[in-house]
Amino acid sequence: MKITAEMIKDLRQKTHAGMNECHKALQQTEGNIEKAIVFLREKGIIKAAQKQGRVTSEGITNIVFAGNNAFLYEINSETDFVSKNEHFQQLVKMLGEIILKKQLSNVKDLLAFNYQNKTVQELLFEKTSVLGENITLKRVLKVTKKPQESFGIYKHQGGRISVLVVLKNDCPSVSEDIAMHIAASKPQFLTPDKVDPTFLAEEKKILHKQAAKELSDKPAQMIEKIIENRLGKMLKDMCLSEQPFVKNADQKVKDYLKANNTDVVYYVRWEMGN
């Protein structure tokens, strides 16, 4: 029997299941809507569909890499308990293998990818049914380095925070230390000259407004000096190169890197849920 778009639409409205699931259910039941509903219930798909809108505020970030390419990805669940479940952990590993093998660098392509006769979206749907919580893929990012550069990776609390660093050369111990520093210190920019001009202009505007209230009795030249000092202190806290190194507070990160004849080309810090 031919399965029409109208039949699929009708079943979707009744069950809130996905289009592919509805199409398969109708094929299995020769177009019988009532039997298709029973089929979806038996597969646990209707329950999973009902969970799809629920908030996923827990989960795991992870990093996989091979050669010159690395990928960060985040998978979410509703509770921390489920994110530690063996089924969830297996899903994280499986998605990492798919991402790396097929070099998939965005959520849309990954969800649509067919793995063992099922799309990744359908696999997530199945896990939602098994685990009893909404399971979602939040984001994917690809980072490519030059052949002479190296990756450094650090994961905190089993993937609640994941950091990827690209160094200009191969320094395994340094890359791990810097990745750990970034996880702890949360720098927003690599160096002062890499600060987003729009962000800088906005911060200066805020500092000027604050100074106008606090320092109205001071000369304009002094106010400008105070603003520049405050801005400098803020950038010191926000720029990786200017931060005190987490393993030696007397040494700036840039000095630690210089002492080891290397430098950070790029970094990314992901925190679960952010």
From Swiss-Prot:
User: What broad class describes the main subcellular location of this protein?
Assistant: cytoplasm
This molecule's function is given as:
Associates with the EF-Tu.GDP complex and induces the exchange of GDP to GTP. It remains bound to the aminoacyl-tRNA.EF-Tu.GTP complex up to the GTP hydrolysis stage on the ribosome.
Its family?
A: Belongs to the EF-Ts family.
An annotated GO cellular component of this protein is:
cytoplasm
NCBIfam families attached to this UniProt entry:
tsf (TIGR00116)
Quote one Gene Ontology molecular function term. translation elongation factor activity
Instruction: Identify the keywords attached in UniProt to this record, alphabetized.
Output: Cytoplasm, Elongation factor, Protein biosynthesis
**What is the name of this protein?**
Elongation factor Ts
Keyword Methyltransferase recorded? no
Q: Where located?
A: Cytoplasm
Q: Where is this region: Involved in Mg(2+) ion dislocation from EF-Tu?
A: 79-82
Taxonomy of origin reads: Bacteria, Bacillati, Mycoplasmatota, Mollicutes, Acholeplasmatales
InterPro entries, per the entry: EF-Ts_dimer_sf, Transl_elong_EFTs/EF1B, Transl_elong_EFTs/EF1B_dimer, Transl_elong_Ts_CS, UBA-like_sf
Among the Pfam families in the record, one is: EF_TS
Q: Which gene encodes it?
A: tsf
Gene3D superfamilies assigned: 1.10.286.20, DNA helicase RuvA subunit, C-terminal domain, Elongation factor Ts, dimerisation domain
- PROSITE patterns per the record? EF_TS_2
